[in-house]
Amino acid sequence: MERLNPADCVYIDESGIEESLCREYGRAQRGQKVLGERMGKKAQRLSIIAGLNQKELVAPFHFKGYCDTEVVNSWLENILLPCLKAGQTVIMDNASFHKSTRTKQLLENQGCKLLFLPTYSPDLNPIEQQWAILKARIRKLKTPQQPLEDAIAQVFKQYG
């Protein structure tokens, strides 16, 4: 196996966020309970997709619903590919919607290589840790009155 230059590696992944995302803790006087509102029903789901190149978030995007091949290819073509340079390696998990012929073709036409991580190995994808950090920041910013999309956009802006 050839050795990859970390500067040429772009890890991509997607993650979901429920509209009901809220803080997991609060403060109160000793002996008092912290009360907060939280929806009891299943909320709308938003998904986020991005690349990670040397700790820098690349081409972050959020949308309503779940990820599929069409969404991935549209994001690749319109948002990620303009950020990539020929010779870079795009690394992603083995999700079935990553494995279309079109996905491979888009990357090859850009002069990029495609590499799949082994099945069930999120620990090999550094963007997984970024999702945890991102969701914690979103959780801090999100208020019951504020749409989740606004909190996500605000956090993406902080990443530059």
List each model region and its residues:
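RNase H-like polynucleotidyl transferase catalytic core
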Residues: 33-40, 110-126
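Short, hinge-like loop/turn segments at secondary-structure boundaries
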Residues: 27-30, 108, 132-135
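C-terminal anion-handling pockets and recognition modules
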Residues: 6-9, 127-160
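Extended, low-complexity cationic-aromatic segments
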Residues: 1-77
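RNase H-like two-metal-ion nuclease catalytic core shared by retroviral integrases
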Residues: 93-94, 101, 115-138
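Generic structural signal for small/hydrophobic residues in well-ordered secondary structure
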Residues: 13-15, 50, 76, 93, ...
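RNase H-like DDE/DDD metal-dependent nuclease/strand-transfer catalytic core used by mobile genetic elements
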Residues: 71-114
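A structural signal for short, well-ordered beta-strand segments and their strand-loop junctions
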Residues: 10-12, 91, 116
